[in-house]
């Protein structure tokens, strides 16, 4: 995932003072000339405009100034957050074994192309978390193209409650005011996987446009007793264009 930073002050039409809001991000070079910036309204997590960066100037380990190539888009002001849209990698994760993982097997939040295929998951929290927020951890990355296919999700998955572990696959961006008209994530396909489930929550999804859950095999496992407060197999919040089909 990337890192969101907050606009603290608009110094001029082309200069903004920003701050790393999470101390584990402090000290990094947030961006470089000609890279693309997304401007995000933090309550809805909607990217309202984009721009180009001319210069990055660190003031200290937490604060920095960004000079823009053109004036700040209308309406963007102090309190908005910025995301570097250039530094967003693709990810191919194949033939891996995720075992003895404390919180999650994978945390994936990038607009790049993501393929998660032919893996075995035995994590104690969610096997896969797709997150994104600009309010707590400030982890950026609204996904645009994610394929989760032919993986084996075994019974330890989601056997303990950790932060954001709402289901075996948890799509859980932190959005104070979700807007169904403008979903945060899009184009997520979960297909041809096998789930060995001792508990009920299989999939939790918030703020997704274009979600497919199809041709998956669901096997009841009795190794542990169900404990999760969610009793539904699939929970959807502020989603649209959802297909759930041919699961068995």
Stretch-by-stretch model annotation:
Residues 1, 102-109, 124-131, 153, ...:
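Short glycine/acidic-rich loop motifs that flank beta-strands on beta-rich extracellular proteins
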Residues 2, 32, 88, 93, ...:
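Parallel beta-helix/beta-solenoid
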Residues 17-26, 66-72:
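A structural micro-motif recognizing beta-strand termini
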Residues 118-157, 218-243:
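Long amphipathic alpha-helical scaffold regions
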């Amino acid at each position: 995932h990337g890192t969101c930073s907050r606009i603290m002050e608009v110094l001029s039409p082309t200069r903004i003072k920003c701050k790393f809001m999470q101390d584990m991000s402090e000290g990094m070079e947030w961006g470089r000339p000609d890279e693309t910036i997304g401007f995000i309204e933090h309550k809805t997590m909607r990217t309202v405009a984009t721009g180009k960066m001319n210069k990055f100037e660190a003031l200290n380990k937490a604060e920095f100034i960004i000079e823009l190539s053109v004036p700040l888009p209308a309406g963007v002001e102090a309190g908005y957050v910025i995301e570097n849209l250039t530094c967003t990698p693709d990810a191919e994760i194949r033939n891996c074994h995720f075992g003895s993982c404390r919180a999650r097997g994978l945390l994936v939040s990038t607009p790049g192309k993501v393929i998660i295929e032919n893996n075995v998951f035995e994590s104690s929290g969610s096997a896969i978390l797709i997150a994104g927020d600009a309010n707590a951890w400030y982890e950026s990355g609204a996904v645009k193209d994610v394929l989760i296919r032919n993986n084996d999700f075994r019974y330890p998955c989601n056997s303990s409650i950790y932060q954001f572990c709402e289901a075996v696959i948890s799509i859980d961006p932190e959005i104070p005011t979700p807007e169904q008209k403008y979903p945060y994530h899009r184009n997520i396909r979960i297909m041809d996987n096998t789930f060995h489930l001792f508990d009920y929550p299989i999939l939790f999804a918030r703020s997704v446009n274009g979600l497919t859950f199809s041709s998956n095999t669901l096997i009841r496992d009795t190794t542990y007793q169900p404990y999760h407060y969610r009793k539904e197999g699939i929970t959807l919040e502020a989603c649209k264009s959802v297909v759930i089909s041919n699961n068995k």
